[in-house]
């Protein structure tokens, strides 16, 4: 039997040209931010998604050490009800 149409060969799907990305800089390393305490909710919100999840390192650009400290600080703020565990979802 022969295949009709497609001869069995697949063309590689190109994702397009790769753009050089700007390296992310850890704001705590350069002194822009300081992990002061759990009460600085405005600073902690930068590292929480719209749904209330802690953002990963690849999105925040933090070092592993600072990511762990931020995660612990966010968890303390959640326990004290300064940050919500989840955001309310609005269904349409």
From Swiss-Prot:
Pfam families noted in UniProt:
Ribosomal_S18
Give the protein name, as stated in the record: Small ribosomal subunit protein bS18
Task: Read off the HAMAP family from this record.
Answer: Ribosomal_bS18 (MF_00270)
Q: So which domain of life are we looking at?
A: Bacteria
Q: Mention one GO molecular function.
A: small ribosomal subunit rRNA binding
What does this chain do?
Binds as a heterodimer with protein bS6 to the central domain of the 16S rRNA, where it helps stabilize the platform of the 30S subunit.
GO cellular component labels = cytosolic small ribosomal subunit
What are the protein's UniProt keywords?
Ribonucleoprotein, Ribosomal protein, RNA-binding, rRNA-binding
Source species of the chain: Deinococcus radiodurans (strain ATCC 13939 / DSM 20539 / JCM 16871 / CCUG 27074 / LMG 4051 / NBRC 15346 / NCIMB 9279 / VKM B-1422 / R1)
InterPro entries attached to this UniProt entry: Ribosomal_bS18, Ribosomal_bS18_sf
Question: Which gene name belongs to this protein?
Answer: rpsR
A GO biological-process term? translation
Tell me which family the UniProt entry assigns to this protein. Belongs to the bacterial ribosomal protein bS18 family.
Renumbered residue ranges of the record's region Disordered: 1-28
Basic residues: bias regions = 12-22
Quaternary structure and partners: Part of the 30S ribosomal subunit. Forms a tight heterodimer with protein bS6.
